[in-house]
Amino acid sequence: MGDYLVREQYLSKIRAGRDDTGVIKVITGMRRCGKSVIMELYAEELRRSGVPEGDIIFIDFEKFEFQKIKTSEQLNDHLHQRINPDRRTYVLLDEIQDVKDWELSLSALNAEKNCDVYVTGSNSDMLSSQLATRISGRHTEIEVFPLSFSEYMEMHKYTDREKAFIEYLECGGLP
C-alpha cells in the first residue's frame, strides 16, 4: 500500500469495533488529516486477516469510478449488487458526505445484520453534534487529528529534533 505512517492509536479504535454490526464506525476529522489512509490500512488489515476480497466493499467517493454515485438510491443499488446476505460484509465508505441523503443508506446498512460499516467524512454534515440525529441507530465516532509532533518526526524520519520542531511549526501536522 505504499509508505504510509501507521497511526496505531486510530487503527486500534477501529479494530475494537470490528464485527459489531449494530454500530456504524464514523471516522471524522478535517480534510487531509489522514482518514482515507487509515481506512485503506484497515482494509488491508482485513485482507491480511483472511477476509476474502469479495467480502470487503471499499468505496472512495472521490475516485472517478465512484463519482457517478450521487444519491442514497444509487449507493443502495451499488451495495445491493455486492453484498452477499449469507456472509459478513465489511463496507468502507470514504468521504460519504457528498452523497445526497447518505444517512438513509447508513441506516439501511445498519439494519443489515451481516454488514460491518465504516465511514469517513470531512465537512459540517459529519459533525458529532449532528451525527446522532442524522444516523438512526448506534454509531461510534473516531476523530482523527493532524499528525502529532512525534508522528511528524517518524513520518519524515528526522533525527534532529530541534530542526524538526521548527519545520513542524512552519508546515503543520497534515500528512
Q: Where are the predicted features?
A:
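Hydrophobic anchor at the beta1->P-loop junction of P-loop NTPases
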Residues: I27
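Conserved lysine of the Walker
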Residues: K35
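Conserved catalytic/switch belt of AAA+ P-loop NTPases
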Residues: E103-V119, A132-T133
